[in-house]
């Protein structure tokens, strides 16, 4: 039987299990399981259904085996910043509150006298986001100090899922770097920051890098799914995995991981933690082989996903993405525009109403139809991509000549064309399953299928269709 590997790729709205194989240097993907991820309201907070996630991860392993696959290894990637605290017995403490919850709204201001953001950025290189792990932990300390007092372990979401599969605890580097508690230079927990914030140092475990074998499936999981395999750490932050799968032609390409979030940037060998970089809110996230993903977080397809969900609730039938794109094309001349980085779009009760209100507040044309709402979102995303690339060129001192888009958003050729037009740069779109591919690439490199990252990236060009949009 052909050797295969399994990527479990979980985003903020859905997860999927994808089998990867490679033959004569050509990779192939086979989706074997898909599930929805959702937020639930609990004790006044927006929380993840963590037990549901664990169950779906395990069910997907079983589905892979039922489909005739026996993976050699499995790797899990998810979104960043969210975490669980565990007690001495390995039992979760409290609820797994999600980054879209509002508990961190005032934390930056409260922490400023203790730890000025200028110092935090200079040490960690991590951009300001209201929901950063550092603010979540401080909000938790304020609301539930007893939970931190009882904690023995801190695990990010993929770390916890790995623990539930193997019984082994580890903090993976790419996700840990997003906490704003890891030194940009040291690549380890920053004791000065942790101590200054009054957080218990003992809960932060040894940091492991992508490619590390964590352990094998526990006996209970193995018996249920019908096989055993090793759990290997990919870049567990989904953006870290997605950036690995960018088949860039040269070092003048901008990377754009397009999903619920749009992460736009480049790979650097060294972090950029200058005051100008801080002012522009660019981040230096840890990557594979200690590369730095120098990028900007942009709201991304979350706004479109929210509009789609809302329309489904109103009518009983969710429109397809092609239908939403077509509605925008019919309103292509509409000039509404908003700032996608505004926190008002993080978790509004109605995205449609919020877009309209933001246009009104900004003195822009207010959309009246679904198509005009969609066109406003497309105008806003393409504008924000263009602005971010201008900032990127200024901060790095380099001129970029193309944009490589990976992830689910790479399928949206209307947005790709608008991005090409706004930036006046050619756009290369694909592969779609960039995150799962990056996850699989780390497993395959570890197994010797590819000699290194350059070899694996060369395989992507041979294995998948990359579409091109030239600026008009």
Language-model segments: which ranges?
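Glycine-rich beta-strand-to-loop/alpha-helix junction loops that act as flexible
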Residues: 77-80, 210-211, 258-261, 402-410
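Active-site core segments that coordinate phosphate-bearing ligands/cofactors
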Residues: 6-7, 19-21, 105, 112-124, ...
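Short glycine-rich phosphate-binding loop at a beta-alpha junction
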Residues: 70-78, 153, 206, 398-407
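Short beta-strand-loop/turn "lid" adjacent to the catalytic site in phosphate-handling enzymes
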Residues: 42, 62-98, 127-133, 162-183, ...
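A conserved helix-loop-beta module that forms one wall/lid of the active-site cleft
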Residues: 191, 197-210
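N-terminal glycine/serine-rich phosphate-binding loop of ATP-dependent small-molecule kinases
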Residues: 1-94, 122, 150, 222-231, ...
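Short acidic-aromatic active-site loops that bind/stabilize oxyanions
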Residues: 46-54, 126, 130, 207-211, ...
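Carbohydrate-associated surface elements
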Residues: 101
